[in-house]
């Protein structure tokens, strides 16, 4: 199955410059413009979504905060995290935003499965989560989530935030591989106080950024296909 998506490996990329380039790409794209998939990692930066509240940024310190036009609230990007930006014409792809989000999440779930990890969706909280006590368990999340503590026993391993303009997507998804997780304690990740953030290394998966990026890129290419 092929999407015609051309993956571009940006390596270590400045966040503000990449954000500007995504917006420019989307602004200038024509009906025949090929879709793209940018893969990169960023220097430490907090990014705030359009729904973000200032009080969720607890103590940024010297880490810059960039206001963006993506959905969602505040998150952190840093070295050791694979960031993927699909630049897709949804009208040409033939599916709507809700399915687009589902397909991105499915790509992350399949990436985690490649490394033997079982990821989970949480209703109303985009992104992918793992069981802290047993990230390799294949058991589904069952029953209503605890009131006031919907993430009990879970850690967030991938964050998702998108923007759609004239049927075209930008922004994307970030998968934590082996990074300094301390900056996540300086914010309420995605607006949730106390939400624990993990990476593949924390849960016992030893892999390289390059390998995780390769697998995620492949899965996105497959699951974003029309």
From Swiss-Prot:
GO terms for molecular function: lipoyl(octanoyl) transferase activity. Residues 31-226 form the BPL/LPL catalytic domain. It is found in: Cytoplasm. GO terms for biological process: protein modification process. It catalyses: octanoyl-[ACP] + L-lysyl-[protein] = N(6)-octanoyl-L-lysyl-[protein] + holo-[ACP] + H(+). The active site is at 190 (acyl-thioester intermediate). InterPro entries: aa-tRNA-synth_II/BPL/LPL (IPR045864), BPL_LPL_catalytic (IPR004143), Octanoyltransferase (IPR000544), Octanoyltransferase_CS (IPR020605). SUPFAM superfamilies: Class II aaRS and biotin synthetases. Pathway: Protein modification; protein lipoylation via endogenous pathway; protein N(6)-(lipoyl)lysine from octanoyl-[acyl-carrier-protein]: step 1/2. Catalyzes the transfer of endogenously produced octanoic acid from octanoyl-acyl-carrier-protein onto the lipoyl domains of lipoate-dependent enzymes. Lipoyl-ACP can also act as a substrate although octanoyl-ACP is likely to be the physiological substrate. Belongs to the LipB family. This is Octanoyltransferase. The gene is lipB.
């Amino acid at each position: 199955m092929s999407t015609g998506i051309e993956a571009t490996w940006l390596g270590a990329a400045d966040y503000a410059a990449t954000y500007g380039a995504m917006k420019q790409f989307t602004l200038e794209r024509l009906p025949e413009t090929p879709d793209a998939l940018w893969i990169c990692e960023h220097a430490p930066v907090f990014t705030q979504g359009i729904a973000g509240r200032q009080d969720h940024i607890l103590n940024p310190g010297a880490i810059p905060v960039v206001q963006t036009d993506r959905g969602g609230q505040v998150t952190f990007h840093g070295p050791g995290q694979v960031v993927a930006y699909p630049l897709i014409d949804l009208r040409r792809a033939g599916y709507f935003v809700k399915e687009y989000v589902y397909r991105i999440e499915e790509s992350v779930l399949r990436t985690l499965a490649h490394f033997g990890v079982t990821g989970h969706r949480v209703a109303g909280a985009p992104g992918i989560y793992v069981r802290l006590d047993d990230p390799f368990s294949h058991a589904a999340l069952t029953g209503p989530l605890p009131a006031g503590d919907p993430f009990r026993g879970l850690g967030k391993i991938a964050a998702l935030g998108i923007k759609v303009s004239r049927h075209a997507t930008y922004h994307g998804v970030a998968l934590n591989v082996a990074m300094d997780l301390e900056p996540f304690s300086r914010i309420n990740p995605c607006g949730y106080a106390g939400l624990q953030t993990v990476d593949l290394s924390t849960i016992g998966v030893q892999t390289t950024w390059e390998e995780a990026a390769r697998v995620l890129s492949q899965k996105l290419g497959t699951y974003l296909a029309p």
